[in-house]
Amino acid sequence: MSGDRDDKRYPYPKDDAELRRRLTPMQYEVTQHAATERPFTGEYTDTEDAGIYHCVVCGTALFESGAKYHSGCGWPSYFKPIDAEVIDEKMDYTHGMTRVEVRCNQCGAHLGHVFEDGPRDKTGLRYCINSAALNFEAKPEWK
């Protein structure tokens, strides 16, 4: 993990026992211990359906399908969140790298990382997000 989860207080209260009951082991490890799914294994990596991606822990709407694109990195990629206020960014110096960790701003769940190698005609950002941190709500009427 990139830092102490208690250095910021998030509005959504979390109960560890309840999270362990409700989340899969992978969802728990990703969101609570900043684990990472293996590339190209996540449920939403190739999803192209219209809809909204929510935080698996608290349900906050995080990304819209219109901002999703195929980056080839092996994880779902978005060029922007649904709103800047839903994301918390924190420097991550783990694994001998310097990266920017992305968390849900409501509950502090680890989502993934953001990089500056996204589509230049959009934001230039690539939000590289673990499928295990997300729930997808289909919106077929958006197509």
Swiss-Prot record:
One of its GO terms (cellular component) is cytoplasm. Its cofactor is Zn(2+). The active site is at residue 128. InterPro entries: Met_Sox_Rdtase_MsrB (IPR028427), Met_Sox_Rdtase_MsrB_dom (IPR002579), Mss4-like_sf (IPR011057). The keyword Zinc applies. Its EC number is 1.8.4.12. GO terms for molecular function: peptide-methionine (R)-S-oxide reductase activity; zinc ion binding. It comes from the Bacteria. Binds 1 zinc ion per subunit. The zinc ion is important for the structural integrity of the protein. GO terms for biological process: protein repair; response to oxidative stress. Zn(2+) binds at residues 55, 58, 104, 107. Keywords: Metal-binding, Oxidoreductase, Zinc. Disulfide bonds: none annotated. Belongs to the MsrB Met sulfoxide reductase family. This is Peptide methionine sulfoxide reductase MsrB. It comes from Burkholderia thailandensis (strain ATCC 700388 / DSM 13276 / CCUG 48851 / CIP 106301 / E264). The gene is msrB.
